[in-house]
């Protein structure tokens, strides 16, 4: 019996690790996450972007320029923004002081809209929807792409057996080969 739950990313990942959550439908694969999860897919490519005020469009073209901006940067707790971002976090200890860890996209985007943060790191698909709203589309733009990676279904190693994982992987490959995955993508 499965039941969909809307959970903050950080909490969902902790629950996957503990085995109290069996599956998360959208997760980037990393070595750390692979210790606790099986991955099936990928089902799409995710692009992580920096979104900020329109007047920053020609002032921020890379992560080093982003770091020179005054103010906070909002990120989603538990999200993966790529190896360059991870390296920056290790090399720039002061960066931690400038991060606002949001529990989800709504909180992050509310902080941006109220100008309590200078920029936000976000999935491009969410930003594209945000920018369709007249007021926000006039005020904010995508500043740069910071990472692109495949997104998978993640299954908890504590909640899903190796045998079930192999079966899921087999059926995923069958759906890919039959064209069913592509038909689902096109129907969205």
Give the location of each predicted region.
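Ligand-binding cleft/hinge of the Venus flytrap
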Residues: 1, 41, 67, 78-102, ...
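Extracytoplasmic small-molecule ligand-binding "clamshell" domains
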Residues: 1-36, 168, 175, 183, ...
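Short helices/loops that flank or line small-molecule/ion binding pockets
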Residues: 10-22, 38, 105-126, 133
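A ligand-binding cleft/hinge motif common to bilobed small-molecule-binding domains
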Residues: 26-35, 86, 118-147
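Hydrophobic/proline-rich hinge and linker segments of small-molecule sensing/allosteric domains
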Residues: 39-61, 154-156
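Periplasmic-binding protein-like
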Residues: 45-48, 135-172
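Flexible hinge/capping segments at coil-to-helix
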Residues: 54-73, 88
């Amino acid at each position: 019996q499965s039941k969909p739950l809307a959970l903050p990313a950080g909490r969902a990942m902790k629950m996957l690790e503990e085995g109290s959550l069996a599956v998360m439908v959208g997760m980037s694969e990393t070595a750390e996450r692979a210790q606790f999860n099986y991955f099936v897919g990928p089902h799409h490519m995710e692009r992580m972007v920096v979104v900020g005020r329109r007047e920053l469009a020609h002032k921020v073209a890379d992560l080093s320029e982003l770091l020179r901006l005054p103010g906070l940067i909002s990120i989603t707790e538990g999200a993966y923004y790529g190896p360059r971002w991870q390296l920056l976090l290790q090399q720039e200890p002061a960066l931690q002081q400038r991060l606002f860890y949001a529990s989800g996209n709504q909180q992050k985007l509310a902080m941006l809209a109220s100008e309590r943060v200078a920029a936000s790191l976000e999935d491009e698909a969410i930003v594209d929807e945000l920018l369709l709203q007249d007021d926000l589309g006039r005020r904010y733009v995508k500043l740069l792409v910071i990472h692109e990676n495949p997104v998978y279904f993640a299954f908890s190693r504590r909640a899903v057996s190796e045998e079930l994982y192999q079966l899921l992987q087999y059926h995923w490959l069958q759906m890919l080969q039959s064209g069913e995955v592509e038909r689902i993508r096109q129907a969205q």
